[in-house]
């Protein structure tokens, strides 16, 4: 199974575990006890290979991480947990960080023109080009 969970600054173990269950089962989860929730996750992941994406993680509390990850250890070898974060400390805490570099300004400009103007030719909109270039500069 593949699961994507938006974490943000609310690293609530119960909520995240519920989100995983709802993604795995495609059903609303009305359970609230963390132990019960984790049994359900374990049952759904045991002997299965999975990909779990935890997007925009901010929490640096290693005890919460350990509690959250407990039922995830039952997946098959090859299962992966991908964590996106802006925090170097979190990246190092959860495993093997891969720092991503930004896209160069020329590539941003090319993409922006295609999205904003419908093509890579901004020539039809010279009055907007200066504003668009300022926006692109901020995207980095």
Predicted regions: what they are:
Residues 1-40, 58-59, 101:
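Post-nucleotide-binding-loop coupling segment downstream of the phosphate-binding loop, primarily
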Residues 8-9, 73, 137:
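Tandem alpha-helical RNA-recognition repeat domains
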Residues 14, 69-72, 120-124:
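Generic detector of short alpha-helix boundary/capping microenvironments
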Residues 20-22, 26-32, 77-80, 87-140:
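Non-catalytic, charged helical/coil tracts that couple and regulate nucleotide-powered enzyme cores
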Residues 35-103:
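A conserved switch/coupling segment of P-loop NTPase cores
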């Amino acid at each position: 199974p593949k699961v994507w969970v938006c974490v943000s600054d609310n690293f609530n173990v119960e909520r995240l575990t519920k989100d995983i269950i709802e993604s795995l089962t495609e059903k609303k989860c009305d359970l609230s006890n963390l132990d019960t929730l984790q049994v359900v996750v374990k049952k759904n992941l045991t002997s299965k290979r999975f990909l779990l994406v935890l997007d925009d993680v901010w929490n640096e509390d290693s005890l919460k991480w350990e509690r959250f990850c407990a039922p995830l250890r039952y997946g098959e070898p090859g299962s992966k947990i991908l964590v996106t974060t802006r925090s170097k400390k979190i990246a190092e805490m959860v495993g093997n960080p891969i720092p991503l570099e930004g896209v160069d300004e020329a590539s941003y400009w090319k993409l922006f023109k295609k999205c904003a103007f419908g093509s890579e030719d901004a020539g039809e909109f010279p009055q907007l080009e200066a504003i668009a270039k300022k926006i692109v500069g901020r995207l980095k």
